Regions:
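Conserved short strand/loop->alpha-helix "switch" segment adjacent to the catalytic nucleotide/phosphoryl-transfer site
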Residues: 33-55
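Conserved polar catalytic motif of the HATPase_c/GHKL fold
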Residues: 56-60, 64
Length: 150
């Protein structure tokens, strides 16, 4: 069985599917960054925000989605660019089981801040958790006040 991730890309869309592991998460992150550079031609600052927040969603798949499974699962990254609306949407999904973390003190150094990071970096963050899996959708406007955005 081939464990290498699969990729489909065009100027408006990117789809990547692979094992929910750290190596694949890194490869999906690199593919997303290249796609953003080539297809969207956005500023480095906006790209960095997108890649950082999507990396957090990928890391959550790796760390949490299949924790109670005996087999390694998969994750999917789907990105789209709407030039008319000047927006980018990226969804990361898995078929695992998401468990809301127990509340922790805000100053607890072990507290996860990933969801807050995604919410801060994206213009809109939606997390849909179902028994059949979890999908995180992150939406960004490319018409930010960043003067280097093309």
């Amino acid at each position: 069985m081939d464990d290498s991730p699969s990729f489909v890309a065009d100027p408006a869309r990117l789809t990547c599917v692979g094992a929910a592991d750290a190596i694949t998460a890194a490869e999906l992150r690199r593919r997303l960054d290249r796609w953003l550079q080539q297809a969207v031609h956005g500023s480095a600052g906006v790209r960095d925000d997108i890649v950082l927040s999507v990396n957090e969603a990928l890391a959550n798949c790796v760390e949490h989605a299949y924790r109670s499974h005996h087999r390694r699962g998969t994750m999917r990254l789907q990105a789209s660019f709407d030039s008319a609306a000047q927006s980018i949407s990226v969804c990361v999904s898995d078929r695992g089981r998401w468990h809301r973390p127990a509340p922790q003190r805000p100053n607890d150094p072990r507290a996860s801040r990933g969801i807050r990071l995604m919410q801060a970096l994206a213009d809109h963050c939606t997390i849909n958790a179902h028994p059949s899996g979890t999908t995180v959708c992150l939406d960004y406007t490319t018409a930010r006040s960043d003067p280097t955005w093309n």
